[in-house]
Amino acid sequence: MSRGLLSRIATTLVLGCGCDMTPADSGPDAGPADAGPPPLTIEWSACTAAGGEVPAECADVAVPIDWADGEGPSVTVFVKRITRPDTTGQLWLLAGGPGGSGKDFESAIEEIQALASDLDLYLLDHRGTGGSDYLDCPGLVPPLGGWSQLDPARVTSCVDALTGNQADALRATRTTQAAQDLGALIATVRGPNDRVVVAGASYGTYWLHRYLQLYPTQPSAVVLDSVCDRCGQWLEYERSHDRLGRALLSECAADALCASKLGADPEAFLQALVSSATPVCPDVVRAFGTSSVKVMAGVLLENPFAQHYLPAFLYRLARCEPRDVTALTTLLSRRTSGLSRTSIATFLQVSLADLAPAPPISEVEAFEATALFSKELDFLTAIAGPVWPAAVPDPWVGSYAETTVPMLMINGVLDPQTTIEEARSFAAHFTGPEQYLVELPRTVHGAVFGSATAAPPADPMPCGAEIMRLFLQSPGTRPDTSCTEDILVGDGFSLGPEADEYLWGTTDIWEG
């Protein structure tokens, strides 16, 4: 079983981007920025990736806290590279969140190398995350009952600590500063004949787009996986989860077997679990890490495999007999441990400083009172917003890059985090002859590796990854997308006996 499959079985990062569109002009003139930043000093040392299995090189690189003041203090950003003989350039990978780091790609290193066989890989940690100077608030962790249970005093303590110990770094943890870090790093390490491809996922596409605004001619090509334009509308993000989740339950109601388990009204079945006055199935709560059934449902909805099994998960969660606990904990054990430690402080800083204002708490409470699917990030930002330090508005926000570089935009039609409607709206601004939007049916977030064409434990290259591979081979040619016809379709709410046995430990996902 490859790390790539495990990463696709993994529950998606708790922090993913939700987006909204704001029509605008192209923003400030790229001007001197695109001419290239001054070179940086980089000293590489031996390290490893993918849990020690892959040799790599790492560097802590000092960059200006504020690129507008190159003589001022510095902050450290962390970059890891995986090189191979006879490559022709570099593939830079930008993680999502905001708050995730380059480590999020390491569980799929083998698969990424397969689709970018002639490129060295560079994993850059955004300011405030991973191995970069980390914005840390140890007390700001998800409450067991969900972000709705967050004590505002914890946010106040976090702000006090950050403004006391990391005030300059906090102010400079912004998308535009991170984009300038990327441009300077590429300018420093790029060889005279290297081609450079930059790929971002989720919030990483927002970061990548800001980079394109600043350096519209620097990269050879770019890939945007799960397109995130005007990110951070966290109430709309949760509404999208609820809408798509309810649509799935409607499919259950129309399926004879599923309806025989959850009843004629599956929404009522889930509502009873969400509203339960007593904890639901404590052993599963411990394995999942939350007691909120609504949050569990929201997280599972994002997973390319777990979404097929969501009705069976709810059915067994409600019954909670020993056989159910065994099956559910087996399913949850298929998650991988290769993801980075997400910086909640960086999530809040970038969300509130660069993406969108916090939603009004009254609107959040009104929506969440009836929601069945939600990760409650709307609660997190609504609670934190009133006490988080105000930021200077960024003039690049709401505008679009003017670039002709080859661009692959790829998005799942069933993505609850970065919706297909938002991807289409974003793509309308990039209509060059080598700029393509590819829509993947039956696919959720993380479309490149979340578009399986076979059920586990089989592990062929996913459709999105194959399309990206073809694009990297020939960015000037529209990639063949015929594999979209082969993207996995479940049999009702199962992926078949072999997958059921592997994921659940039984071929009877309802009763076994």
Regions found by a protein language model. Give the residues of each.
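Long, low-complexity segments enriched in small/aliphatic residues
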Residues: 317, 322-355
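Gly/Pro-rich cap/lid or specificity-loop segments adjacent to the active site
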Residues: 36-293, 349-512
